[in-house]
Amino acid sequence: MRQFVLYASFTLRWCFEDETTEATESLLTLLQNEEALAWVPGIWQYELLNGLGKGITRGRVDRQRAFLLWQEIQELPLRIVEIPIDRKLLELALAYNLAVYDASYLSLAMEHHLALATVDGKLQPAARLAGLDIIAP
């Protein structure tokens, strides 16, 4: 089974038709078929729900569809991991010039030696520097 760390904005690409790509759809299909497991830090849920909320207020998705998407994503094979909020996380953020919440994704990927599915312009090079594989859209 393929396993990887899933960044929130990568996940949101599944929710907005103009942002989907072959790569994002391929990962979604793997998860839907239970051929993959996505690891996410606890903050991922807040970021995802916030992104859906912004999508509603900006007219990119209607409420009913957003709630349906939220439910469908929650049913995917996910391993939600609470990342300790401590000095180590801050040190990682500073070392790679990342926001602390982005460092939580990097920390999770590094700890479990997993690829990182991300669209973030700062997180991708940080993951490469850390020796991690990147799954990009």
Segments from the language model and where they lie:
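Acidic, PIN/NYN-like endoribonuclease modules and their adjacent C-terminal/linker elements
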Residues: M1-Q3, L98, L106-P137
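Short, well-structured N-terminal submotif of metal-dependent ribonuclease cores
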Residues: M1-I43, G55-Q64, A130
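A cross-family signal for key residues in well-ordered alpha-helices
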Residues: L12-R13, N50, L90-E91, S107-M110, ...
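Alpha-helix capping/helix-boundary segments
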Residues: F10-T11, W44, Y105, K122-L123
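Phosphate- and divalent-cation-binding pockets in alpha/beta enzyme and binding domains
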Residues: A23, E47, P125-A127
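Active-site neighborhoods of divalent-metal-dependent phosphate/nucleic-acid chemistry enzymes
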Residues: E75-V119
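Active-site-proximal, substrate-binding regions of enzyme catalytic domains
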Residues: L49-P77
